[in-house]
A protein has these predicted regions:
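N-terminal hydrophobic/helix-forming segments and targeting peptides
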Residues: 1-176
Length: 176
């Protein structure tokens, strides 16, 4: 087995944003790679990839679901900040200060960061004690927005997907 190839493919697949309900790009990528290797993959109704890999007797079958954790915009706040609802088992404390991408249904992809509301440790005396939830965190867009109208003018709306940077690292010792 060519481990460099396997790790390269894994890193490529992990870099594709694919929270549940938004998996077409990842499933298409995986299907394309399997097709290039001479297999005949099929996509399931729910967005997974099914592929018979062959073999003698009982053939080996691959069934892959390619969804990851993510979020969806629940509210655009009056100050232009965004609250999200989790998709899958996403936890706010695990993604505080993480970079994210918002996929607008209308106008492209925008970047931002999930952070604690009132994130200044110099001003917020309870910063260290504040419970991190999706009610106490917000996405700050990397755009010059100051209001909900500014955000909507970009084409961003409630229901748009929010995907977090997976920060995939493969160490020299083989840890991923």
């Amino acid at each position: 087995m060519n481990m460099d190839y396997c790790l390269s493919e894994l890193k490529a697949l992990l870099s594709i944003d694919s929270p549940s309900g938004f998996t077409d790009k990842a499933a298409d990528y995986l299907s394309g790679e399997l097709t290039a290797l001479g297999y005949a993959p099929e996509k399931t109704r729910k967005g997974g990839v099914f592929c018979c890999l062959g073999g003698e007797g009982s053939p080996l079958v691959l069934m892959a679901h390619v969804d990851t954790l993510g979020g969806m915009i629940s509210t655009i706040k009056p100050n232009g900040r965004i609250t999200i609802t989790p998709i899958g088992g996403l936890r706010a404390e695990n993604c505080e200060a993480e970079n994210c991408r918002i996929y607008s249904r209308f106008s492209g992809v925008y970047s931002g960061t999930l952070q604690l509301c009132n994130a200044s440790i110099h001003v917020n005396g309870s910063y260290g004690e504040k419970l991190r939830t999706f009610e106490t965190t917000e996405v700050v867009l990397d755009e010059p927005v100051k209001s909900a109208d500014d955000v909507r003018a970009l084409g961003i709306e409630a229901g748009d997907f929010v995907c977090f940077d997976p920060r995939t690292v493969i160490t020299e010792s083989g840890y991923i």
